[in-house]
Amino acid sequence: MKSGFVSIIGRPSTGKSTLLNSICEHQISIISSIPQTTRNKIKGIFTDKRGQIIFIDTPGFHLSKKQFNIALMHNVHSAIKETELILYVIDIQDKPGIEENEILTIISKSKINFLVVINKIDIQKTKEREIMIFLEEKGIKKDNIIKISAEQKINIEEIKDKIYENLQEGPLYYPEEYYTDQEMNLRTSEIIRGVTIKKLKEELPYSLYIEIEILEDRKNKLFIKANIIVAVESQKGIIVGKGGKGIKTIGEEARKIISEIFEKKCDLFLQVKLRKNWNKNPKLIKNLIN
């Protein structure tokens, strides 16, 4: 039996979280077209008769010098150090740039085995030729490259096969039925944050986080009270919406997902609260992403 830890890295919006969810066959990580949706190192677990793979989904790699983004990049680097294999995900629509050079340099210095995963092959207009030339120039062997569509689940089984080829014999780190090690509080807050980001599109994704005040199982029914925290007063109105319609829609969708995932009915109560300039508070940022 084989087992091991695998980090998933790549630029923002390359489909890392979609890949994780597709392999593990559960919604573990937030999926959004908005860059930098993933903040924490999210673990997904896949177990079959061959063994167990523990995936670590990481924030999108970029070179921004903003305080919040530097903290996110710390998560990327620490995830790489924890793993036996790296999945480097490239969006087939993106022409290789500075980030690709930087990521391959980091991978090379780590001395860790890696696979290059070219994602979104179901899309018509691509930069496949440029990507393949770039990888060839970097000395990446074709055996280390796999082309997939995480969203359409094309070549997902092939990825699993390739991963197991690169892992050593080892124990099961988690019980077979586990597909994530996230605590209920974190999973719940990530669901609410994901729904909020989806509804707001590009307006506020970096300026909000979710604070769970109460999460209780009351007679096989979840009771949840949560706050959507924003950094600026004007952002409250954007989330609440006209006549409270915005926050009501967020609550309804989040409640449905929470009920489906935890297989229990759910009472969810949401409020929007201001915590001025929270995204410039180093201590709070550290707590949120670790």
Swiss-Prot record:
Gene3D superfamilies: 3.30.300.20, P-loop containing nucleotide triphosphate hydrolases (3.40.50.300)
Region (G3): 57-60
Biological process, per Gene Ontology: ribosomal small subunit assembly
SMART domains recorded: AAA
Compartment(s): Cytoplasm; Cell inner membrane
Region of interest: G5: 148-150
GO molecular function: ATP hydrolysis activity; GTP binding; GTPase activity; ribosomal small subunit binding; small ribosomal subunit rRNA binding
Primary localization: cytoplasm
Region entry G1, spans: 10-17
G2 as annotated region, ranges: 36-40
Entries under InterPro entries matching the protein: AAA+_ATPase (IPR003593), G_ERA_dom (IPR030388), GTP-bd (IPR006073), GTPase_Era-like (IPR005662), KH_dom-like_a/b (IPR015946), KH_dom_type_2 (IPR004044), KH_sf_prok-type (IPR009019), P-loop_NTPase (IPR027417)
Protein role: An essential GTPase that binds both GDP and GTP, with rapid nucleotide exchange. Plays a role in 16S rRNA processing and 30S ribosomal subunit biogenesis and possibly also in cell cycle regulation and energy metabolism.
UniProt-recorded name of the protein: GTPase Era
Protein species of origin: Borrelia turicatae (strain 91E135)
